[in-house]
């Protein structure tokens, strides 16, 4: 059986009003971005230090590089810059790693002014996470 990539699912009406911003750079980030692209026909922004080739060569990802040792302030500054560059978009912030999920929880007040945040608050995250 062969797969015809030209017949993959396409959104009925592409959503150019949303912009997923995904923190990280591994294959899981690629998977999240691909799901958004297939469901809504939108581009995504990857914010990471060394995104995988699947992200950097993707036709639906733009990449914003940050240092591998970026502080909360530096990462927050990058995300606020992205928000300022896209005032007409509904920004959705996603993460695929506990470190970045904790970052979002710590900075929820500032980030929620610009991004939809499908994350629990820090208290809930600390109570439920046991790794």
Each language-model region and where it sits:
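Preference for protein termini
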Residues: 1-53, 84-90, 95-98, 110-111
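Conserved N-proximal alpha/beta basic substrate-recognition cap immediately N-terminal to
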Residues: 56-131
């Amino acid at each position: 059986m062969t797969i015809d990539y030209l017949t993959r699912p396409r959104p009925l009406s592409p959503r150019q009003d949303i912009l997923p911003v995904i923190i990280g750079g591994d294959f899981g980030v690629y998977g999240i971005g691909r799901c958004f692209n297939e469901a809504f026909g939108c581009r995504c922004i990857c914010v990471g230090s060394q995104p995988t080739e699947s992200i950097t060569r993707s036709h639906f990802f733009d990449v914003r590089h940050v240092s591998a040792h970026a502080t909360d302030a530096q990462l927050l500054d990058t995300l606020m810059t992205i928000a300022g560059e896209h005032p007409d978009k509904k920004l959705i912030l996603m993460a695929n790693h506990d470190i970045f999920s904790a970052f979002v929880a710590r900075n929820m007040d500032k980030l929620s002014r610009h991004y939809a945040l499908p994350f629990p608050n820090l208290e809930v995250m600390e109570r439920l996470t046991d790794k």
